[in-house]
A protein has these predicted regions:
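Negatively charged, low-complexity tracts enriched in Asp/Glu with abundant Ser/Thr
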Residues: 1-35, 56, 60-69, 73
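C-terminal basic regulatory modules in eukaryotic proteins
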Residues: 45-92
Length: 92
């Protein structure tokens, strides 16, 4: 489990994003923009990797709108597929 998260950490091109290890089986990748923060949550389970992508909006800029928009949630069986998906999400 720890080796898979280390593999992701070592092989991701973060492009200005920040990577934090939250627990032994979870990492958070985020970057703040003017109106929102893009967050990518990666959780490793026994047989799968779950990737969630959120946009968290600044409520001072948009006080009448939603605070959080969950864009996608995907589960992967392969570390390589999850790496490709996370890297693509960072670049978009």
């Amino acid at each position: 489990m720890k080796n898979n998260l280390n593999y992701l950490k070592n092989n991701l091109n973060l492009c200005g994003y920040t990577l934090l290890r939250v627990t032994n089986n979870k990492i958070l990748i985020f970057k703040s923009f003017y109106k929102y923060t893009k967050c990518i949550y990666v959780s490793y389970f026994d047989t799968s990797i779950e990737v969630k992508i959120d946009k968290v909006f600044d409520t001072e800029v948009y006080p009448e709108y939603i605070e959080r928009l969950m864009i996608t949630k995907k589960c992967f069986d392969s570390i390589y597929d999850s790496l490709w998906y996370i890297q693509r999400s960072i670049l978009i």
